[in-house]
A protein has these predicted regions:
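Recognition helix of helix-turn-helix/homeodomain-like DNA-binding domains
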Residues: 32
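Short beta-strand->loop micro-motif that forms the acidic, two-metal-ion catalytic signature
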Residues: 45-49
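Catalytic core of pol beta-like nucleotidyltransferases
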Residues: 1-26, 35-40, 51-92
Length: 92
């Protein structure tokens, strides 16, 4: 992964933290970028685990969507975040 891409992902992670604040438990890069077999047209898969209920998560969904859209357009990226309750993840 290029230094530029690392910097962009770090910038995106900081934007996530601004949205969810102290509710962020973990932010996980997965998929082709995590495995190292990405291509120039690969998307960037990011999972956001937060300590809030699914109902609370829905209140943040639009803000995450708008921020991601703007970030993708500004940087010619295809970041695809998934926000999940850490409580639900621990059940699996």
């Amino acid at each position: 992964m290029s230094k530029l891409m690392q910097d962009l992902i770090e910038e995106y992670v900081e934007a996530i933290k601004k949205i969810y604040g102290s509710h962020v438990c973990q932010i996980i890069l997965y998929g082709s970028y995590a495995r190292g077999d990405f291509r120039p047209d690969s998307d960037v898969d990011i999972m956001i685990l937060v300590d809030m209920s699914d109902l609370e998560l829905k209140a943040y969904a639009q803000q995450l969507s708008y921020m991601t859209y703007d970030f993708n357009m500004d940087n010619d990226l295809d970041i695809k975040p998934i926000a999940k309750s850490e409580e639900m993840e621990s059940l699996f």
